[in-house]
From Swiss-Prot:
UniProt entry keywords in alphabetical sequence: Acetylation, ATP-binding, Kinase, Lipid metabolism, Membrane, Mitochondrion, Mitochondrion inner membrane, Nucleotide-binding, Transferase
Reaction equation(s) it catalyzes: a monoacylglycerol + ATP = a monoacyl-sn-glycero-3-phosphate + ADP + H(+); a 1,2-diacyl-sn-glycerol + ATP = a 1,2-diacyl-sn-glycero-3-phosphate + ADP + H(+); an N-acylsphing-4-enine + ATP = an N-acylsphing-4-enine 1-phosphate + ADP + H(+); 1,2-di-(9Z-octadecenoyl)-sn-glycerol + ATP = 1,2-di-(9Z-octadecenoyl)-sn-glycero-3-phosphate + ADP + H(+)
EC number: 2.7.1.107, 2.7.1.138, 2.7.1.94
UniProt keyword annotation of Phosphoprotein present: no
Residue ranges annotated for the DAGKc domain, each copy included: 58-199
Membrane topology term: Peripheral membrane protein
Record-given protein name: Acylglycerol kinase, mitochondrial
Pathway stated in the Swiss-Prot or TrEMBL entry: Lipid metabolism; glycerolipid metabolism
GO CC annotation, single: mitochondrial inner membrane
Essential cofactor(s): Mg(2+)
UniProt xrefs under Pfam families: AGK_C, DAGK_cat
InterPro entries named among the record's database cross-references: AGK_C (IPR045579), ATP-NAD_kinase_N (IPR017438), Diacylglycerol_kinase_cat_dom (IPR001206), Lipid_Phosphate_FormReg (IPR050187), NAD/diacylglycerol_kinase_sf (IPR016064)
GO BP terms in the entry: ceramide biosynthetic process; glycerolipid metabolic process; lipid phosphorylation; protein insertion into mitochondrial inner membrane
Length: 421
């Protein structure tokens, strides 16, 4: 034993390196063990739903999964098959997985797809936007859009995951929680933005549209990968050297928020008795007729704004969902063009992690419908749900509570008012 410790002391560099390697290996193995425990617990919970009996005349629920294998730098397929697929199969659903091969394929497939009970998106913001656009471009979108949508966050950017699921630093737990939310069946309504250019078909967004210098610098961050943790600040610093001040000129016309109509019951109420129907007919017959002027809807008031901004964003409220709001609107945020170079680098670096961050002095407008007009010859690009589109004049319309998404029951309870209040 003495000789053993003497050898360790004489070769202390190798001993130190070996201990570090052993510690790292133990930590890695422990993490894998914890991930397996999470998967097992999620599968056991899903199996409870799969073991439930269904009526003889009922059919097994069909789920169609749109999987983007290229998401998360090509790791999405492995993440889905290890963490999500077993849960879906154990839940008793008839699962069909559609793997997309190229950008825009999900959009085309959805325009032709037959009806299903559940649509599941396994990918990031780009895949989700394709699926939503494909659903809402269908000729029968009024009925097809009622199909609930599940979102399994596998991409590098998954903006809605913070709204729909509990926060988790563990990737495996985040994916299993999202998949279990689909199995449990709790849903929340989310707004959609319809963005229409002059010629092309409309594009639909769950998060919003960004146009400006912060966005342009953010997409160049990967170009400076060799700078490691400094790459984000470097992208914004070099952006200030190209042109300064960076301003974007445009004009925008918009209408204000609209009152939210009462929520319609999902189940059809029972037909009233014959006696009640007769009384209702008599009451409507003897009721005073309304004047035509009282039935007229007041015309919408449009407001015009000329803007000079460093960045413009038009966003839904899905990232800060309020189920009890009495108004429906989208946010138009006009950030000031007086931002200094230092603030541009600091704020821009934070915006890469949190696109909802705003510079001091930002003007926010509430609108239900707007048109954005750009000066002739304007170059650059929009980001619509993290996907790049050519900058052009667009019409943006809010479709309030258009789609229903599966949500973690714990998150849904937090959005509703407490019964004790």
């Amino acid at each position: 034993m003495t000789a053993f410790f003497k050898t360790l002391r004489n070769h202390w560099k190798k001993t130190t390196a070996g201990l570090c390697l052993l510690t790292w290996g133990g930590h890695w193995l422990y993490g894998k063990h914890c991930d397996n425990l999470l998967r097992r617990a999620a599968c056991q919970e899903a199996q409870v739903f799969g073991n439930q009996l269904i009526p003889p005349n009922a059919q097994v629920k069909k789920a169609t999964v749109f999987l983007n294998p290229a998401a998360c730098k090509g790791k999405a397929r492995t993440l889905f098959e290890k963490n999500a697929a077993p849960i879906l199969h154990l839940s008793g659903m008839d699962v069909t997985v559609v793997k997309t091969d190229y950008e825009g394929q999900a959009k085309k497939l959805l325009e032709l797809m037959e009806s299903t009970d559940v649509i599941i998106v396994a990918g990031g913001d780009g895949t989700l936007q394709e699926v939503v656009t494909g659903v809402l471009r269908r000729t029968d979108e009024a009925t097809f859009s009622k199909i609930p949508i599940g979102f399994i966050p596998l991409g590098q950017t998954s903006s809605l995951s913070h709204t729909l699921f509990a926060e988790s630093g563990n990737k495996v737990q985040h994916i299993t929680d999202a998949t279990l939310a689909i199995v449990k069946g709790e849903t929340v309504p989310l707004d959609v933005l319809q963005i229409k250019g002059e010629k092309e078909q409309p594009v639909y967004a769950m998060t919003g549209l960004r146009w400006g210098s912060f966005r342009d610098a953010g997409v160049k961050v990967s170009k400076y990968w060799y700078l490691g943790p400094l790459k984000t600040k470097a992208a914004h610093f070099f952006s200030t050297l190209q042109e300064w001040p960076q301003t974007h000129q445009a004009s925008i016309s918009y209408t204000g928020p609209r009152e939210r109509p009462p929520i319609e019951p999902e189940e059809t109420p029972p037909r009233p008795s014959l006696y009640r129907r007769i009384l209702r007919r008599l009451a409507s017959f003897w009721a005073q007729p309304q004047d035509a002027s009282s039935r007229e809807v007041s015309p919408e008031v449009w407001k015009d704004v000329q803007l000079s901004t460093i960045e413009l964003s038009i966003t839904t409220r899905n990232t800060q969902l309020d189920l009890m709001s009495k108004e429906d609107f989208m946010n138009i945020c006009i950030e000031p063009d007086t931002v200094s170079k230092g603030d541009f680098i600091i704020i821009g670096s934070k915006k890469v992690r949190d696109p909802g961050l705003r510079a001091a002095g930002t003007e926010c407008l509430q609108a239900s419908h707007c048109t954005l007009v750009l000066p002739e010859g304007t170059e650059g690009s929009f980001s619509i749900d993290s996907e790049e589109y050519e900058a052009m004049p667009v019409e943006v319309k809010l479709l309030p509570r258009k789609l229903r998404f599966f949500c973690d029951p714990r998150k849904r309870e937090q959005m509703l008012p407490s019964t004790s209040q």
